[in-house]
Amino acid sequence: MTNKHFEKISDLNIKFFESAKMSLLDPLGLYLANDVKWIELNGKWNSLKFPVAIGGKGQPIILLHGFDSSFLEFRRIYQSLKRNFQVIIPDLLGFGFSPRSATNEYNPSKIISYLIDILETLRITNNLKIIGASMGGSTALKLSFEIPNAINKILLLSPAGLFGEPKNIPFPLNQVGASFLGLPQVRRSLCRQAFAYPDKCVGEMEEQIASIHLGCKGWRDSLASFAKSGGFAGTQKYIQNIPIKTLCGENDRIL
């Protein structure tokens, strides 16, 4: 592909995001989405632009979302954090609204490399705090292992993938699994599982947030590629001499 072709793909991805943003029902989601900046990375990522929500002033704090989610996962804590920190919320590579033509494969190593490039582009080199939710918790530990001198605190929210070994899902099961996760009834069920009191807390706004990124071109293929890699597992071995706190819900059905 030529540079012009990648540029066109990037523009189409941004156009989809802008359309999705205007359809958001949750005012907190819209508030967060309005702070998205499109960060252009180097040729390693085909010079594409990636969505990163950035707001506030102070010491930097990066928030890492979970599997098959997006930056919108943090809409309910963004405004509060923004009062005291420079908040940075990227979509992980191959997830959310990130362009799916940045690479031919999606795996934990590529995600970490991408995050390091995001931080370098934003010139963040020290005093970085990390909040990682679900799979984002494992991502946080691996990131801190790669750049320990840049990190000073980590908060893990119901972290997933800390133990065990990666389980590669071969073709065509990875594609079948990704297609299954795209079914509306499956999305609704998973969304409800993420809340302790789904009957009271889950409505149209929450269900929309959980699925709005599925319209990104290449969503299924990037998800299948990540599944084929085995994903994050056994990341407790990456724990460094960095202050870490873990917070889990009493009735966390996903964990």
Language model region names:
Residues 1-41:
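An N-terminal hydrophobic leader/cap segment in hydrolases
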Residues 35-46, 50-53, 88-131:
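Active-site loop/oxyanion-hole signature of alpha/beta-hydrolase fold enzymes
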Residues 48-97:
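Conserved HGGG/HGGXW glycine-rich cap/lid loop of the alpha/beta-hydrolase fold
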Residues 73-75, 98-104, 165-168:
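Conserved catalytic-core motifs of eukaryotic protein kinase domains, centered on the activation segment
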Residues 132, 136, 140:
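Gly/Ala-rich beta-loop-alpha elbow adjacent to hydrolase catalytic centers
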Residues 141-146, 151-181:
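Flexible "cap/lid" loop of the alpha/beta hydrolase fold
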Residues 165-167, 183-242:
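Conserved alpha/beta-hydrolase catalytic His-Asp/Glu region
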Residues 240, 246-252:
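Short beta-strand/loop motif that positions the catalytic acidic residue
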